[in-house]
């Protein structure tokens, strides 16, 4: 019996470089190496994504309705397209003036008296307060003992860069997204992009398999941390606001899969959400491969969607000394003014990584189904390799897992295509860490493989 090979027949999604399908995002990343024609097409495509121009009545038009050709679009919008993509200073909020509160304490020796609206009194009156009614609507409060107040203030983030979706591209504008957290909005658009990249409608694809042979494998390791979910839930009472009935369910890390099943595919087959820090995409792929290779699944939608660019997530990771900081970049670059475009430096002289948001999906089939349907095959998955790090003093420190899983992957490739192909006709496409400790071990793994 021949072993089933899971193959990639479609891919799509969105990140800071733009749309993934048909390599738009990749072309933006390597734009300085493109031919003039490819560069022009990439700029025009991104200008459309960013809402600078649109395709209407078989012509490109700007927001004022003026008809433009590709050359004019490049001349007019190239700088804006390039500066509004990839890693850049945070645009979602003002990272230099993040709203917050300053705790102020009045010592017990000094009583404090103030007037306030009666309706603004807390439900549970502090024990140190004496409340005197002045009218039907006003009271006077006198404090006896130490009293604390939270006063509206602002603070500055130490890390001010992120990999954000292109400026002007707002997922919520493309469908009815009321109450949906940003990460779920991105999941809806990302999976649609992947499915449409196949070139065969989902209705036609699903006719060739039974419902139980379709699987959706998707998750979000952080869950949803925006105001519509955990972000709003955890801050509501501290801000004097109420929680909503949607914040808890929409925050769950399985929601990307649930949204895809319910709002995109109408899937009644298998569904699964697996997470594992920055390896979550690998974990979802591993789950899909397991089911395809066993014959349980023949058509799978696989991916993840994350939208963690919030002040709280930035602060939390900065407190771990994980994120690149302004002071850190000044130190290693020897400059006063930091270029946030250069904040992420995998395998280079760096001082941390950057936050990013992205929605990335692939569509997998078993090789027999792909050949039957005549789909384009972009690649295959002979296997996935995952190893834990064993005992170590710090959970975020490097461990032997990198060496073990990578050596297993290379060994699998050697068995599949032979030593000569690996030496002369292969390359390693690596995700590089921007943390000083991990970059050393990851570089070591790649060096050993090259040798």
Regions found by a protein language model. Name each.
Residues 1, 199-215, 232-245, 262-270, ...:
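Structural signature of cysteine-dependent C-C bond-forming condensing enzymes
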Residues 1-173, 368-380:
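ACP-dependent fatty acid/polyketide chain-elongation machinery
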Residues 2-16, 23, 27-31, 328-421, ...:
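Condensing-enzyme catalytic core mediating Claisen C-C bond formation in acyl metabolism
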Residues 43-49, 90, 138-185, 223-287, ...:
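Conserved catalytic cysteine-centered active-site region
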Residues 186-199, 254-257, 284, 366, ...:
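Short, well-ordered amphipathic alpha-helical segments that serve as non-catalytic structural scaffolds
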Residues 186-200, 253, 257, 271-306, ...:
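Active-site-proximal alpha-helical scaffold in enzymes
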Residues 191, 216, 281, 288, ...:
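Conserved small-residue
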Residues 296-351, 384-398, 432-439, 451:
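Acyl-CoA/ACP chain-elongation machinery
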């Amino acid at each position: 019996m021949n072993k089933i090979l899971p193959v990639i027949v479609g891919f799509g999604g969105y990140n800071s470089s733009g749309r993934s399908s048909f390599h738009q995002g990749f072309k933006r990343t390597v734009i300085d190496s493109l031919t003039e024609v490819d560069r022009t097409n990439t700029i025009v495509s991104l200008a459309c994504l960013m809402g600078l121009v649109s395709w209407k009545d078989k012509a490109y038009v700007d927001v004022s309705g003026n008809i433009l050709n590709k050359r004019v679009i490049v001349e007019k919008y190239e700088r804006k397209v390039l500066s509004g993509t990839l890693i850049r200073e945070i645009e979602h909020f003002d990272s230099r003036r993040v709203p917050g509160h300053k705790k102020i304490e009045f010592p017990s020796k000094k009583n404090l008296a103030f007037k306030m609206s009666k309706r603004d009194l807390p439900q549970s009156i502090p024990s140190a307060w004496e409340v005197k009614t002045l009218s039907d609507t006003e009271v006077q409060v006198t404090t006896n003992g130490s009293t604390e107040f939270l006063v509206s203030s602002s603070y500055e983030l130490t890390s001010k860069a992120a990999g954000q979706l292109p400026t002007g591209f707002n997922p919520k504008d493309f469908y009815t997204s009321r109450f949906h957290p940003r990460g779920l909005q991105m999941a809806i658009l990302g999976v649609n992009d992947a499915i449409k990249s196949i070139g065969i409608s989902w209705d036609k694809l699903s006719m060739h398999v039974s419902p139980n042979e379709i699987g959706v494998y998707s998750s979000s390791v952080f869950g949803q941390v925006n105001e519509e979910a955990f972000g709003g839930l955890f801050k509501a009472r501290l801000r004097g606001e109420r929680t909503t009935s949607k914040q808890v369910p929409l925050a769950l890390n399985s929601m990307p899969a649930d949204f895809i099943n319910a709002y995109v595919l109408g899937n009644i087959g298998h569904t699964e959400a697996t997470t594992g820090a920055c390896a979550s995409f690998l974990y979802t792929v591993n789950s899909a491969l397991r089911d395809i290779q066993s014959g349980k699944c023949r058509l799978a939608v696989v991916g993840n969607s994350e939208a963690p660019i919030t002040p709280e997530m930035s602060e939390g990771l900065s407190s771990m000394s994980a994120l690149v900081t302004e002071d850190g970049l000044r130190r290693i670059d020897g400059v006063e003014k930091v270029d946030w475009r250069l904040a992420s430096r995998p395998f280079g002289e760096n001082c941390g990584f950057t936050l990013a948001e992205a929605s990335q999906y692939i569509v997998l089939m078993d090789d027999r189904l792909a050949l039957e349907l005549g789909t384009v095959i972009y690649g295959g998955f002979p296997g996935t390799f995952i190893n834990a790090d064993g005992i170590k003093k710090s959970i975020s420190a490097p461990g032997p897992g990198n060496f073990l899983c990578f050596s297993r992957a290379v060994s699998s490739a050697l068995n599949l295509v032979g030593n000569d192909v690996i030496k002369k006709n292969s390359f390693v496409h690596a995700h590089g860490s921007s943390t000083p400790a991990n970059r050393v071990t990851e570089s070591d793994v790649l060096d050993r493989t090259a040798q």
